Amino acid sequence: MGQSLTTPLSLTLDHWKDVRDRARDQSVEIKKGPLRRSGTVAPASGGAGAPGLAAPVEAMTEYKLVVVGARGVGKSALTIQLIQNHFVDEYDPTIEDSYRKQVVIDGETCLLDILDTAGQEEYSAMRDQYMRTGEGFLCVFAINNTKSFEDIHQYREQIKRVKDSDDVPMVLVGNKCDLAAHTVESRQAQDLARSYGIPYIETSAKTRPGVEDAFYTLVREIRQHKLRKLNPPDESGPGCMSCKCVLS
């Protein structure tokens, strides 16, 4: 406890940057096999049965995820917790960081390409660019910060504008659920998510509950979005209505 009072700020920031860099390095070291993006299968090298060649590596689907939210809500901490199973509580404002992690979700081997974005208002002009490339979005607020919850509407509207669509895969994430003090109640967040037609998940980047669930749920939302585009509902039929399951 005494150490936290005497450790120079420069050292804590250096520690944060070291952990972040190691998480980046770890993501870069992922074995580079064939990828399929947006449902397109990449060709495997070496045909089946070719003499002296190993069997082709199964193609992975790449998902481009973007983490958005106000400054200080724990976007970087969530991402590093997923990538490296490590929590860093020193705050070092992010401009833009990219991470990659290979995972298996519902039996499918996936490569998550995660963009951790700036929450500071002075970088708002950069948002359009990374929103164009993202397939799905984690919209993060802190449950002890009412303003960050109110800001979610702004991020969602910007995403819809940039993507020129009302149907964009998103997950609402209430971070810092390990804290005793809540200024945003679970029911408020659930009601907001329900009005948007998206899942809501509470997370703690510090103690890890909900972290994998948040990212994996977003991947599932992207999959469902692709299926809807391939098989659009027949809106001419009687009683047809669009709906989306909301997790709470």
Swiss-Prot record:
SMART domains: RAB, RAS, RHO. Gene3D superfamilies: Gamma-retroviral matrix domain, P-loop containing nucleotide triphosphate hydrolases. One of its GO terms (biological process) is signal transduction. Keywords: GTP-binding, Host cell membrane, Host membrane, Hydrolase, Lipoprotein, Membrane, Methylation, Nucleotide-binding, Oncogene, Palmitate, Prenylation. It is an enzyme of class 3 (hydrolase). The keyword Nucleotide-binding applies. Residues 28-48 are annotated as: Disordered. NCBIfam families: small_GTP. This p21 transforming protein was generated by a transduction of rodent cellular H-ras-1 gene. This is Transforming protein p29. It comes from Rasheed rat sarcoma virus.
